[in-house]
């Protein structure tokens, strides 16, 4: 019986008029038919509609599998993320279809690729009038909420309640962040990761208990510029993190795209915004400094703690004896210390939310999904950021807990994409999946211990558009199969790359055009053509060269 229905009074039409007359004259005889009815209902229970699951869609910004212990990462322990994986399923081959914040979010909402939903780059504005899975769930009786990072430069639609970060062009601030909440602008005091969780729990406390809910719980962290919570400032100051094997990649064996990017730890990380190598006195001398714009949002006691935490770093750098590879290694350590400290707060707050659901008795009736908008480079190839189709960026975390359908401790190698999330939510909610959604429901995988169905897709499709732009990552598209990857870089270059992901998981040696891979290359080219036709990406090589106009399109830190 749906939670919105109330039990109706018993119907007595099956009793004869004589029996009813006896019952009226001797009320105690009511006990007999009531007992009989009770026994009958136990023996022949009425068929009731299965209670529809709640949905909590947890998403962070720029979190990557290398920084999750449930994926075998050795950088940090994430016990609450691990709990979701251990009590549910971990997907090992989940891929973003356009590894950039706004486009990824649009693909997730619509279940469609960027060329279909119209949001191809971070300069786009999301057309909220189009079909999204929250709208469809809302129409089907779900109470819907969007809390945290939205980053689609339009008012959220399809939500009964929304409270989204509004500072820095919807990127949001870590400290005392601005929110746009149900049409009103407010400033919240505190740390963003904690505040977003407070807001999520507040929604759950005040929701309509007679409806299933779908809550999108989206954190800013661990996005650049990686500002830790006050309790985590300096927590990794004395930790030395292992370096990736290709931190000093020279890009031999690759083409111009890898060589001409602008996202290296060596050259692109800034001393102020990223590495935080400014004292308070230096920031106050030039209050137009970008770091000061976020530093000034902190309460004075947090500023004091910040100054103390970064004093050692500033002193080390100013000794002036760091050069070459030693300087790159040093920068890498500072980057990791800040990035991973922001992940700590994310994991702690996931624990808060799980504990609250357990407390109110809704944990096992809630589909809990944790993912990120894409992966991220943590020093691999000498890089930070995302955008490329290379593995650390294209691959995204996906762990799901729902004990009514998922066997605890399952893993899946099925090739999945973020366009699959929308049809999966609709499928579990009992809502018909529209025929124009391009993703596939993961329900058959989830209900079969992660096994790949026989008729499942052979490849994930990818298409990145934001060029020319910040970080100078060329436009490209391609496919990722279980064993190989094929990429075409286009626009102002025309270069192909192909990788054997089993023999070369770090993607160091381009094998496109190698005689020994000729047969496989032909197969992949054919599969790419078929995949583009399937997803209606009919003109992937369009040559637009002028993309970014106006202040918003020139903004950094997206």
Curated annotation (Swiss-Prot):
Keywords noted in UniProt: Hydrolase
UniProt-listed InterPro entries: Alkaline_phosphatase_core_sf, Phosphodiest/P_Trfase, SGSH_C, Sulfatase_CS
PROSITE patterns recorded for this chain? SULFATASE_1 (PS00523), SULFATASE_2 (PS00149)
| Function, as annotated | Exosulfatase involved in the degradation of the glycosaminoglycan (GAG) heparan sulfate (HS). Catalyzes the hydrolysis of the 6-sulfate groups of the N-acetyl-D-glucosamine 6-sulfate units. GAG-specific sulfatases play a key role in the persistence of the major human gut symbiont B.thetaiotaomicron in the host gastrointestinal tract.
Report whether Hydrolase shows up as a keyword of the record.
yes
Question: What is the recorded name of this protein?
Answer: N-acetylglucosamine-6-O-sulfatase
The PTM 3-oxoalanine (Ser) maps to: 101
EC number assigned by the record: 3.1.6.-
- Organism equals Bacteroides thetaiotaomicron (strain ATCC 29148 / DSM 2079 / JCM 5827 / CCUG 10774 / NCTC 10582 / VPI-5482 / E50)
Describe the family membership recorded for this protein in Swiss-Prot or TrEMBL: Belongs to the sulfatase family.
Which GO terms fall under molecular function for this chain's record? hydrolase activity
The kind of enzyme this is, by top-level EC class, is hydrolase
Give the free-text PTM comment from the record.
The conversion to 3-oxoalanine (also known as C-formylglycine, FGly), of a serine or cysteine residue in prokaryotes and of a cysteine residue in eukaryotes, is critical for catalytic activity.
Q: Which Pfam families match?
A: Phosphodiest (PF01663), SGSH_C (PF16347)
């Amino acid at each position: 019986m749906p939670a919105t229905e109330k039990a109706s009074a018993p119907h007595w039409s099956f009793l004869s008029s004589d029996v009813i007359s006896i019952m009226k004259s001797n009320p105690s005889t009511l006990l007999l038919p009531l007992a009989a009815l009770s026994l009958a209902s136990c023996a022949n229970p009425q068929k009731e509609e299965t209670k529809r699951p709640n949905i909590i869609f947890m998403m962070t910004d720029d979190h990557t599998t290398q920084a999750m212990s449930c994926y075998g990462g050795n950088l940090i322990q994430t016990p609450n993320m691990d709990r979701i994986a251990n009590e549910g399923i971990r997907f090992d081959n989940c891929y973003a279809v356009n590894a950039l914040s706004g486009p990824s979010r649009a693909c997730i909402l619509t279940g469609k690729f960027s060329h279909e939903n119209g949001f191809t780059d971070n300069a786009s504005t999301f057309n909220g009038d189009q079909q999204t899975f929250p709208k469809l769930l809302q129409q089907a009786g779900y109470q819907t909420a969007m809390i945290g990072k939205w980053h689609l430069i339009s008012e959220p639609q399809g939500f009964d309640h929304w409270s989204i970060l509004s500072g820095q062009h919807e990127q949001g601030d870590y400290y005392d962040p601005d929110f746009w909440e149900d049409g009103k602008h407010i400033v919240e005091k505190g740390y963003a990761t904690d505040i977003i969780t407070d807001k999520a729990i507040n929604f759950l406390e005040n929701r309509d208990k007679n409806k299933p809910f779908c809550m999108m719980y989206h954190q800013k962290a661990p996005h650049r510029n990686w500002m830790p919570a006050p309790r985590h400032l300096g927590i990794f100051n004395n930790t030395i993190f292992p370096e990736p094997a290709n931190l000093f990649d020279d890009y031999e064996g690759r083409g111009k795209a890898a060589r001409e990017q602008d996202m290296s730890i060596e050259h692109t990380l800034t001393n102020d915004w990223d590495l935080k190598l400014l004292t308070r006195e230096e920031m106050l001398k030039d209050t137009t400094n970008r770091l000061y714009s976020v530093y000034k949002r902190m309460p004075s006691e947090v500023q004091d703690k910040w100054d103390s935490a970064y004093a050692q770093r500033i002193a080390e750098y100013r000794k002036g004896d760091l050069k070459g590879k030693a300087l790159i290694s040093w920068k890498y350590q500072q980057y990791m210390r800040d990035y991973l400290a922001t992940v700590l707060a994310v994991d702690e707050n996931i624990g808060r939310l799980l504990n609250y659901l357990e407390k109110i008795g809704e944990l096992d009736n809630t589909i809990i999904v944790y993912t990120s908008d894409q992966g991220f480079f943590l020093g691999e190839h000498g890089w930070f950021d995302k955008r490329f189709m290379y593995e650390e960026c294209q691959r995204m975390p996906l762990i799901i807990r729902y004990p009514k359908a998922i066997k605890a401790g399952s893993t899946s190698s099925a090739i999945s994409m973020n366009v699959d999330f929308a049809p999966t939510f609709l499928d579990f909610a009992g809502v018909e999946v529209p025929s124009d959604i391009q993703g596939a429901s993961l329900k058959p995988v989830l209900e079969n211990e992660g096994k790949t169905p026989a008729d499942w897709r052979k490849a994930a499709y990818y298409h990145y558009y934001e060029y020319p732009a910040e970080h100078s990552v060329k436009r490209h598209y391609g496919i990722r199969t279980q064993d190989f990857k094929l990429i075409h870089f286009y626009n102002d270059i025309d270069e192909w790359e192909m990788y054997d992901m089993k023999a070369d998981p770090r993607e160091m040696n381009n094998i496109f055009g190698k005689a020994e891979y000729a047969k496989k290359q032909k197969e992949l080219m054919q599969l790419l053509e078929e995949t583009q036709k399937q997803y209606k990406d009919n003109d992937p090589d369009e040559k637009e060269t002028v993309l970014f106009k106006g202040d918003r399109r020139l903004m950094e830190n997206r």
